[in-house]
Amino acid sequence: AWLVRRFATTTLPTVASLSTIRAERSEAAVRRNPFAGIGAPVLGVEIAAEEAVPPPGSDFFRGMLSDVSAVRSLPSLPQTGPELRQLAMALGAGEESLHLAGAATEANVKALDLSSTSVVAFATHGLLSGELSGLAEPALVLTPPDAASPDDDGLLTASEIAELRLSSDWVILSACNTAGTDGRPDAEGLSGLARAFLYAGARSILVSHWPVRDDAAARLTTGTLSRIGEDATIGRSQALRQAMLSLMEDENDQSLAHPSAWAPFMVVGEGGH
């Protein structure tokens, strides 16, 4: 806790990646859409996020595609919709910026023009490679279709994310374990979803190291963006640090002072403003 009380920190996948990230600033910055929020997928029973992933033996694939009925059986995340709405409000974005429930599909995400969107946020389940039987790479869970196809089987994988066209200042992943590896035996941390979003064109990403509490994740993401909305000069890492301190010092819920609540998230990439 002493580190976050004194410093705001940012992580880079590699030192060389910093020059690439800064080179990706484009003229699109002057004509940006402020926000796109994707999440609250239509899934099964409601349950706390940290209890949401089925056991590793669950069979989630039929051939190369996911079993959409199995994806649909994943627990729903009722707080993710309100969380994304709060993020939109913090950036002055309207309801049209939100792609929730039935609109939060893999096909819709691939069809969206996100190339001029400043902040893109996903609020859903994050899956590690191998976490479900047959899952060869990390993925984000979206609303599954009636029938799986190569373009949409309910799982937006790291390789599919890398093919998106982004020029976002920030991608926020309000999901579990999004700082994980790409699944190779010798893979390093951040080589999965984080690297995929950087490759797609994000300058910075908010990722998590372990399963996150729904309530804490929502407060951290909305608190971070609210601080940036109030002070355009504040950096992303500093805004996250202040949101973490707010949780740690909450006298109404002392469980939030435990690092398991406030510490999973970190900024990867460009931590400034």
PLM feature segments, named:
Residues 1-273:
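Catalytic cores of enzymes
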